Structure formats: C-alpha cells, structure tokens
Amino acid sequence: MTGKGQGFGFGLGKMKELAEAFKKAQQVQEGAKRLQEELEQMEILGEAGGGLVKVIVSGNQEPKRVEISPDALAQGADLLSDLVTAAMKDAYIKSTATMRERMEDLTSGLELPGF
C-alpha cells in the first residue's frame, strides 16, 4: 500500500463519479414513483374475436373492466371463455411491453461507476 492518501483506491475522481451516480439513482427513483402512478392511471386494451371481447387493464396489469359484445354471448359459454382468456392475454402482453419500455426509458443513461 502506498501512503499517499489514496485509501482503497478511491481517489477524488471516483468520489465525484459515485456522487453523480447517487444523484442519477435518486432521479431514477423519483421517476419510478411517477411512472408507477402513470401506469396505474393507464388503460390498455386487449381484444379477441375481432373486438367481440375487450379487456381493459392498467399499465401494471390491474384489471379495470371487461366488455363483452352481445354477439359473443351467442357463441356459447366455451367459446366465450376462450375469447375472454385470449383478450386477457392480449392485454397482459401489451401492458407488460408498455411497462418494460417505460422502465427502459427511465433507466437509460444510468451508468454506475465500478459496476
């Protein structure tokens, strides 16, 4: 070890980088809080059967409502069940993709030194 006050190899430049990283991390945390609120308010539509069944979920996959066309009811219980399931999957896939995109936007440019 050298006795030049460098401690654990953490010079002033590294401290500055680390402080900047903490600042960015704090911004990301604040952005994540806003994003969570935004996702809760969002309405994402999943459909099946050409719109016979629609499922609306929030950006974080919370079910909001289901709309079933009278024409879908005439299809019988088994087909209706399949349509609801397909619409739910569609809504889930779309909301997951939306959440992933928003998180990537939020964390882009976040580079932590030494990691």
Swiss-Prot record:
One Pfam match: YbaB_DNA_bd
GO-annotated cellular components: bacterial nucleoid; cytosol
One MF annotation (Gene Ontology) recorded for this entry: DNA binding
Keywords: Cytoplasm, DNA-binding
Principal subcellular localisation of the protein: cytoplasm
Residues of the signal peptide: none
Localization terms from the record: Cytoplasm, Nucleoid
HAMAP family, per database record: DNA_YbaB_EbfC
Oligomeric form and interacting partners: Homodimer.
Purpose of the protein: Binds to DNA and alters its conformation. May be involved in regulation of gene expression, nucleoid organization and DNA protection.
Family recorded in the similarity comment: Belongs to the YbaB/EbfC family.
Record protein name field: Nucleoid-associated protein Ava_2322
UniProt organism field: Trichormus variabilis (strain ATCC 29413 / PCC 7937)
Lineage, highest ranks first: Bacteria, Bacillati, Cyanobacteriota, Cyanophyceae, Nostocales
